[in-house]
């Protein structure tokens, strides 16, 4: 059995519904809009506007359906059982033209401070507003810009901020969790929270990729909401403004926690995990002790061991 998958627009999806045979639409799998049988082939239309035909002559049946609906496609997804990429053109999704949830995190590469994860819902209308406000890849923005921008967009967009503080981070590390697992759990939970906050239908959920989809789903510790609409994008901040917005809010939250550590310790600390961080950690050990240091840092980083060695010199 072969599978043929076509990526449709909203308008094309509606046309397909009109030409498909009537079928019972109760008890459909999550994310499925319509399912029927044609000439022994299973035809499934998803909420994500993907049309999948399963059967021996899936391509023939697919072309018949498209022709009947008056649709000519230049883009289609490859056969699910084929590794060939010849004669196939994959459409690059313009996420900002859709209602999207995007998620990203901050702090995962920093010895000091928590890990923050944010999911945000950005409608097509708000995407334009965020662009006017200057939302962009947060890696190109300084902390002051992040704070100013975050405080403008937080009231505008539905979002969920989750903070994994250092104590909880270290506890999960002791339980054998990797950072990838922590991220998967937090991203999935934040996305669920946002879905519960909004009433509008979501076209896509796009995650700034930190793991392949199979690994993400294995680690997420729960059902993946709107799985068929979920996409993973490398350098996602530059591809979806929903991810860029989440990145800004996540960095904003991280910066605020980072500033609180500086206030508590009276020591100017540095982001990242470089040699300067080792020296700063050693100063904190001298002032407050290793137990205190562990409450504001990620214990699994090598900076801890290096700081202890500096103390002994």
Swiss-Prot record:
One of its GO terms (cellular component) is ribonuclease H2 complex. Coiled coil: none annotated. Pfam families: DUF3378 (PF11858), RNase_HII (PF01351). Its main location: cytoplasm. Keywords: Cytoplasm, Endonuclease, Hydrolase, Magnesium, Metal-binding, Nuclease. It catalyses: Endonucleolytic cleavage to 5'-phosphomonoester. Its cofactor is Mn(2+); Mg(2+). InterPro entries: RNase_HII/HIII, RNase_HII/HIII_dom, RNase_HIII, RNase_HIII_N, RNaseH-like_sf, RNaseH_sf, TBP_dom_sf. It is an enzyme of class 3 (hydrolase). Belongs to the RNase HII family. RnhC subfamily. Endonuclease that specifically degrades the RNA of RNA-DNA hybrids. This is Ribonuclease HIII. It comes from Macrococcus caseolyticus (strain JCSC5402) (Macrococcoides caseolyticum).
């Amino acid at each position: 059995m072969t599978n043929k998958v076509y990526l449709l627009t909203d308008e094309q999806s509606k046309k397909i519904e009109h030409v498909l045979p009537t079928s019972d639409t109760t008890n459909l799998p999550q994310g499925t809009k319509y399912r029927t049988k044609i000439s022994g082939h299973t035809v499934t239309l998803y909420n994500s506007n993907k049309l999948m035909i399963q059967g021996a002559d899936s391509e023939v049946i697919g072309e018949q359906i498209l022709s009947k609906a008056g649709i000519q496609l230049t883009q289609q997804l490859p056969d699910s059982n084929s590794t060939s990429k010849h004669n196939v053109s994959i459409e690059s999704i313009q996420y900002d033209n859709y209602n999207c949830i995007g998620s990203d995190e901050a702090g995962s590469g920093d010895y000091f401070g928590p890990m923050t994860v944010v999911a945000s819902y950005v409608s097509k209308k708000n995407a334009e507003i965020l662009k006017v406000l200057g939302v962009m890849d947060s890696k190109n923005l300084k902390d002051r810009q992040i704070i100013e921008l975050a405080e403008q967009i937080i009231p505008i967009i539905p979002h969920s901020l989750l903070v994994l503080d250092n104590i909880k981070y270290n506890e999960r590390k002791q339980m054998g969790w990797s950072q990838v697992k922590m991220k998967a759990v937090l991203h999935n939970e934040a996305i669920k929270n946002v879905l519960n906050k909004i009433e509008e239908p979501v076209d896509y959920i796009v995650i700034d990729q930190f793991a392949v989809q199979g690994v993400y789903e294995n680690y997420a510790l729960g059902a993946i909401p709107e799985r068929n609409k979920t996409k993973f994008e490398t350098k996602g901040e530059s591809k979806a403004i929903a991810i860029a917005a989440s990145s800004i809010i996540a960095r904003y939250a991280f910066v605020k926690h980072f500033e609180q550590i500086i206030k508590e310790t009276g020591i100017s600390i540095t982001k990242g995990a470089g040699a300067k961080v080792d020296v700063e950690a050693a100063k904190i050990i001298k002032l407050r002790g290793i137990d205190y240091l562990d409450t504001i840092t990620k214990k699994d980083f090598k900076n801890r061991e290096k700081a202890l060695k500096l103390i002994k010199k």
